[in-house]
Design a protein with these regions (language model features):
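Alpha-helical cap/lid subdomain in secreted, periplasmic
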Residues: 3-18, 31-172
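Short beta->alpha junction loops
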Residues: 21-28
């Protein structure tokens, strides 16, 4: 989604915003904590979007909601300690479907934790999950087109759902 967000910014503010994808595929919040200094803090960002819920919910990673919250709070605290003016945005994503849901049966609790932390810390939340649920329930074929592997939104889904919602949440 970072590439599609960059394209959306470029379309509105050419050359004024740089989106850096500091994440890595298949990683979860424990990895985020371990790599935060090098991959995020060292870049001195103005804004950081954090979204590890869907991978924290992955059963083989054995990351409880409590540990995921502790990791999330740690990342927030460390980012703000290094740059108090950094805007931190929390984000939920799409529901996993098919085999991916079976591997993440408690995904709702992880997304709710993100909502709770955003509210408690007064952080902006981009809650994509309800939008994705509406798409899934109203037009499964469209959902499948937007999320072709059942877990990762493809470029079209990112361009049509994720990037516009982030821009809207930012008031842009």
């Amino acid at each position: 989604w970072a590439q599609e967000l960059q394209k959306a910014f470029d379309g509105r503010y050419p050359g004024q915003v740089k989106v850096i994808n500091s994440g890595q595929g298949s990683m979860w919040s424990t990895w985020g904590v371990e790599n935060l200094d090098e991959r995020v803090i060292a870049k001195n960002p103005d804004t950081v979007i954090i979204e590890f819920g869907i991978n924290d919910a992955y059963l083989p990673y054995e990351t409880s909601v409590g540990l995921a919250r502790s990791n999330l709070e740690d990342m927030i605290d460390r980012i703000l300690a290094s740059n108090a003016r950094c805007e931190i945005i929390l984000m939920t994503m799409n529901p996993p479907v098919d085999i991916h849901l079976g591997r993440r049966p408690n995904i709702g609790a992880y997304y709710q934790m993100y909502r709770d932390v955003a509210k408690a810390r007064k952080l902006l939340l981009v809650d994509h999950h309800p939008t994705w649920i509406k798409i899934l329930e109203s037009d499964k074929a469209l959902f499948d087109r937007y999320v072709p592997d059942g877990i990762h939104p493809g470029p079209e889904g990112c361009a049509k759902v994720i990037a516009p919602a982030i821009l809207e949440a930012l008031g842009l």
